[in-house]
Amino acid sequence: AQVGTGPGGNQKIGQYEYGSGGRPFLDVAQSGSTYTFNTTNLTVNLNHGTSGSTAYSYTGPRNTINGAYSPLNDAHYFGRDYWTPSTNFNQGGQGVRQAAADLGYSTADVIDAFRQVGV
């Protein structure tokens, strides 16, 4: 459901708020006060590892971490538009380039990040 809120962005493009100022809400599953990125294109919590299958969840509706911008919110939102489970790195390459541009990162840095986690 489109009910999650929280910060996004970075120092390069500035901070913005999901669910406010014309930005869409985050697509999350809600159970009581727990909100989970368990949707069609789920976002997995790797717990600082390189593999896993548990969807990330938080007590909400606002997803913040120590008041900082939330890269996880951006990954979940932009991943919906640029990456689907049926794509692979080569097929999703254009989406990766577009996501990098939208978030103000260099394409090389984003591609390197995917390679480091085995994608």
UniProtKB/Swiss-Prot annotation:
Keyword Protease: yes
Essential cofactor(s): Ca(2+); Zn(2+)
Gene Ontology, cellular component aspect: extracellular region
Main location: secreted
Any GO MF annotation of the entry: metallopeptidase activity
Record key words, sorted: Calcium, Hydrolase, Metalloprotease, Protease, Secreted, Zinc
Protein name as catalogued: Achromolysin
Compartments, as annotated in UniProt: Secreted
Known EC number: 3.4.24.-
Family, per entry: Belongs to the peptidase M4 family.
Biological function: Has staphylolytic activity.
BP GO terms, sorted: proteolysis
The keyword Cell inner membrane is assigned to this record: no
Organism: Achromobacter lyticus
Comment on bound cofactor: Binds 4 Ca(2+) ions per subunit.
